[in-house]
Amino acid sequence: MNKKVLSILIISIILSGCCPNESIKPNNTDTSPIIVSDPIKEKTFPFTGKPMTSNNTSLPFMAIIENSKDARPQSGLSKADIVFETMVEGGIPRFIALFHTEMPKEIGPIRSARPYFLEISQSLDLPFAHCGGSEDALKSIDLNNLMSLNEMKFADAYWRDNSKKPPHNLYTSSEKITSLLNEKQINKIPTSNLKFDSSYWDNKDFKKCSHIKISMNKSYDTSYKYEDGIYKKLIGEDTFIDKSSNVELSLSNIVIQQTSITLSKDNIHVEIPLIGEGKGYVLSQGKIIPILWSKKDLTSATELKDENGNIVSLSEGKTWWNIVDKSNEISLN
């Protein structure tokens, strides 16, 4: 072979070995920061933790409801988000119920206001339906310009059931109260310090309790029985029934707030201090924990904390809130 040709061939082989045939790929790596958006938080009703539709326009309000023997069975309580129960004069229990998640067609019997019911409504910043009140309550309504929906001023928002004797026959409805709120331009945006997290009650250290009885006085006791994932309320041995819907109450949470209930200076009415702190219990999902409650002032909300100082979470759903004297007997099963 020609030496010149051979030299060229050798040089070509050497050069091809030094330059491997690698394809050059463009660098498509995107070095711009990745933005991760927070998940959209589901809107919920503030007093039950239930999901709220985007087009919900219901206005929250409260109603003072009688609980004497002549008033039972009451209407509308099965649809209340929260019912606060305590005593009035004569050892007779009375309720102030909060409505927002569900709006009943009939609510009552409506009765008169007391200062401690006003304080509950102030702490939640909500209007309340009632018919008259004690002298101290009516003075407080005027002095503090409270959102009173007094039947004595707004009779068109109420009616009498002639099948029952007065004063146990005064009723209202969500529709009538909502109309009155719109007329008075009371469009409160509800807020709540309550925390809802059902998983809180998965704690295996919480004590099980399927039945609790509160003896509020010699003539009245109430109890709560946990069955099939809900609490049913009993007065004495009778299951509590909603007259308007003919259903038993289905409750997710029971709160027991212990305070000192004393007789007023007039020796007729009672005083129930709700500002300060004290002990109590919360029941949910068939379990019970001791709690410490506190309230800073007239308009602040009541906080519920466990014995370690952590905020107590409620299960999603309705709550019955008992305000009792700390000497009342409480029996657990």
Predicted stretch roles:
Residues 1-4:
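Positively charged n-region of N-terminal signal peptides that target proteins for export
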Residues 14-17:
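C-terminal motif of bacterial Sec signal peptides marking the signal peptidase cleavage site
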